[in-house]
Structure formats: structure tokens, C-alpha cells
């Protein structure tokens, strides 16, 4: 395999108008790989450190320091290393940084390099990225968990739940699932407009109407599904990302105008699951409310997928704690939460080995980079969360999955309902 000739970075823009890091890696055989790093709005306190410049430039959000680290220290450290040894590359990056949370060089610098090296190695091998990473086992196309109604930190809609998603579980192929999702999305616009509500969009392409409650938002989506000609719970199921750490303070959940205990929130979710065909709830409790997660998992874990995002932050050690405690039963996978591909692979492998489902995910601040689409297939995640079927930084991932499905031809399998074995409608 070819060795690394040059590693360079560029400060580019993400979908929220903030700077982010793009890295280009050139190998000595002329192969090249490029990757751009995403950034979150609602970030967990246990995530790897995203290095920002501070000061006045870009309101403190510049990434010139991270770019400079890539162009100097990291370029020097990786020179001549074999690009196909991802473990060695990532271990070199971790040792060079030297901190537990990647705060010296920044997880945004490390991740950009880690992903770009993988792209370059795939190019050198003459393989698609998903095939290079996943080998022949990478053939399952994920269910698109489409965030078609935005709330929380992703919008100014007034509703506390951050994401209301649809899951096209009844489709036969990914292409069909995308069609179903797009039709429901457009139907939702008509439903919202007919009620005199705003059809403005949130960070991830979903609509952000001002609604009074979680149930009111779900009712809009239910109406849209039926208006589009699909059967609720059979063709299309529902999912939530509550992002509850955003409204948790001093041991209390400030939810929908009331102050709730962890036990009371568990009952809120039990009521929702009873009334709606919900297959998945992400971050239903605070990122450090381990006892609450155990209680919730005991109550609803045999019925739905309970996803740890801020709880696990794609970190194998935190995931292991969750496994040991019996907290949640699924892992959200965000590459920039942990900072290298090798650590991401370890987290996914640990999850699958212990019966936890996995959902590959974007961030609210995205770029046209499509790496996570390939990773979702390579790692057999079975689910991907990358926004509404709108805004090019979201659609880019869906389009890449369409290409992968075409590439695989008869070998492609759409996860569909099998991605949610606990759901029985």
C-alpha cells in the first residue's frame, strides 16, 4: 500500500455558516482522499473536544488553529506511514495529541485526518469507501430516520423535543424508502400550511412550526403520513430525539411547562409509546441520569429502541458502562464525538457484540461530505439519521446511499422493519 506523502487542511464553511475543517491526504502513488468535519448544536459534555480559535474572528468559531496543527505537526507525524494501516494512523494521532479528550490538537483536526486517510487508502485500492472499510459484509442499506419536524436546539418552534422522525420501515429498497420519506415530507408541508403555521425550516431541513406539545407535533406527522397514502405503523413508523439534557437542570426536567422527575419522564414516554407507533427514542433522559436510563430500559426496552447519544458519545468506555448497567439498548454513532475512525469502529463492534442496535448520524452543522453514508453500510448499522430530504448537505448522504445501492445491485439488502426487532405493531 502507498505511503502518505502530504496531509493538508483548509478552513471551509458548514451548513450553519460556521467554519469547519477539511483535510486532504495525498499518497505517494498519486491517490487522494478528502474529508470535512461536522459540528453539533446540542453537544454532550462527554464528547471529544472541538478546537475553536476564540477571539473576534468568526465570532470565536474559527478553526485556524486546528488547520495549522494539521498542516504542521500532523503532516510531519504521518509522513511515510502506510495509508491502509488505519489503526496505526489513528494511534499516531492520539499519541501526538496526548490528552484524554483530544483537547490539544482538537477532535476536529484528528477526525478530518482520520477520515481523509481512509478515503485516500480506498482510492489507492480502487475501492468504494464502504467496500474498503466493510469488505464483502457491507451490504445492508440503512433505514433513513428522517427528521422532518425540528424543535429544541435545532429550531425556534417552541416544542422541547428536538427531532421528530419518520422511519419508512415497510419499503423494499432504500430507493423506495427515500421516496416514501420525501412524499411524507411534502405532505407535511401541506398539512402545516393548511393549519396556518410556518413552513420555515430548522437546521436539519425539517419544518419548524410553532406547536404546543409533543403530541401536537406527532399528530401533524400522523396526518401527513395518512395524507400521503401510507399506513401508520406498517409503512411508516415514528421516532424521537428528545435531547433531554438541553432542558435538564438541577435534577429536574423542565418539559412542556412543567418540572418533572426522572420517573415522571419515564411515564411520559410510556404514554407516548402507548398512543403512537414509536420505534425509537433517543436521549430521553440526561446524559448522566444512569439510574433513569436503567428504569426506562426495564420498562420500555422490550418494546422500543432506546438510543444513547449524549449518554454514550460514541465512546467505547461509556458504552461499556451502559452495557454493564443495562442502560439503553442502542448506540447513536457520531464520528466527531470520539474523533477517529478506529475508535468509532470499536464502539460499533462493542454495541453489536452486546445486542445493541446502531444508528449512524450526522450533526446539525454539516457539509457536502458523504463519509457517514459509506460508514453506515460498511458497519452494518441498519439505520442512518441525516436529516430531512431537503438541504443539499443532508440530501448528499441520501444520494450517496442511492449510489451504493445501485453499486451493490442484487447483493443490497434494505434493513427495513428488521432494524427494529423490538417493535411489534
From Swiss-Prot:
The active site is at 204 (proton donor), 334 (proton acceptor). Binds a second Mg(2+) ion via substrate during catalysis. It catalyses: (2R)-2-phosphoglycerate = phosphoenolpyruvate + H2O. It is an enzyme of class 4 (lyase). Its main location: cytoplasm. GO terms for molecular function: magnesium ion binding; phosphopyruvate hydratase activity. (2R)-2-phosphoglycerate binds at residues 162, 334, 363-364, 385. It comes from the Bacteria. Its cofactor is Mg(2+). The keyword Cytoplasm applies. The keyword Mitochondrion does not apply. Catalyzes the reversible conversion of 2-phosphoglycerate (2-PG) into phosphoenolpyruvate (PEP). It is essential for the degradation of carbohydrates via glycolysis. This is Enolase. The lineage of its organism: Bacteria, Bacillati, Actinomycetota, Actinomycetes, Mycobacteriales.
Amino acid at each position: 500500500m502507498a505511503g502518505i506523502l502530504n496531509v493538508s487542511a483548509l478552513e471551509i464553511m458548514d451548513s450553519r455558516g460556521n467554519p469547519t475543517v477539511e483535510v486532504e491526504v495525498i499518497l505517494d502513488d498519486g491517490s487522494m482522499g478528502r474529508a470535512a468535519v461536522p459540528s453539533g448544536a446540542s453537544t454532550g459534555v462527554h464528547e471529544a473536544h472541538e478546537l475553536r480559535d476564540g477571539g473576534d474572528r468568526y465570532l470565536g468559531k474559527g478553526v485556524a488553529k486546528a488547520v495549522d496543527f494539521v498542516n504542521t505537526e500532523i503532516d510531519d507525524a504521518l509522513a511515510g506511514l502506510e495509508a491502509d494501516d488505519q489503526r496505526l494512523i489513528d494511534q499516531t494521532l492520539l499519541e501526538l495529541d496526548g490528552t484524554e479528550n483530544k483537547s490539544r490538537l482538537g477532535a476536529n483536526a484528528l477526525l478530518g485526518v482520520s477520515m481523509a486517510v481512509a478515503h485516500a487508502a480506498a482510492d489507492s485500492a480502487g475501492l468504494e469507501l464502504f467496500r474498503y472499510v466493510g469488505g464483502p459484509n457491507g451490504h445492508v442499506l440503512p433505514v433513513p430516520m428522517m427528521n422532518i419536524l425540528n424543535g429544541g436546539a435545532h429550531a425556534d418552534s417552541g416544542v422541547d423535543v428536538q427531532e421528530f422522525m419518520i422511519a419508512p420501515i415497510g419499503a423494499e429498497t432504500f430507493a423506495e424508502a427515500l421516496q416514501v420519506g420525501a412524499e411524507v415530507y411534502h405532505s407535511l408541508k401541506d398539512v402545516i400550511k393548511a393549519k396556518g403555521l410556518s413552513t420555515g425550516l430548522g437546521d436539519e431541513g425539517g419544518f419548524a412550526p410553532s406547536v404546543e406539545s409533543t403530541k401536537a407535533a406527532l399528530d401533524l406527522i400522523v396526518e401527513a403520513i395518512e395524507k400521503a397514502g401510507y399506513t401508520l405503523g406498517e409503512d411508516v413508523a415514528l421516532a424521537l430525539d428528545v435531547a433531554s439534557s438541553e432542558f435538564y437542570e438541577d435534577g429536574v426536567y423542565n418539559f412542556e411547562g412543567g418540572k418533572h422527575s426522572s420517573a415522571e419522564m419515564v411515564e411520559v414516554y410510556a404514554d407516548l409509546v402507548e398512543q403512537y407507533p414509536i420505534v425509537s427514542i433517543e436521549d430521553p433522559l440526561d446524559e448522566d441520569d444512569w439510574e433513569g436510563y436503567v428504569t426506562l430500559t426495564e420498562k420500555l426496552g422490550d418494546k422500543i429502541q432506546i438510543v444513547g447519544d449524549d449518554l454514550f458519545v460514541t465512546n467505547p468506555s461509556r458504552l461499556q458502562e451502559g452495557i454493564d448497567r443495562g442502560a439503553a439498548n442502542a448506540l447513536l454513532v457520531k464520528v466527531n464525538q470520539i474523533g477517529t475512525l478506529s475508535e468509532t469502529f470499536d464502539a460499533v463492534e462493542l454495541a453489536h457484540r452486546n445486542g445493541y442496535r446502531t444508528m449512524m448520524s450526522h450533526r446539525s452543522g454539516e457539509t457536502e461530505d458523504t463519509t457517514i453514508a459509506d460508514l453506515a453500510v460498511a458497519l452494518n448499522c441498519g439505520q442512518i439519521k441525516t436529516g430531512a430530504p431537503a438541504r443539499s448537505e443532508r440530501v448528499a448522504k441520501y444520494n450517496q446511499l442511492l449510489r451504493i445501492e445501485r453499486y451493490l445491485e442484487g447483493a443490497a439488502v434494505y434493513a427495513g422493519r428488521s432494524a427494529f426487532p423490538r417493535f411489534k405493531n
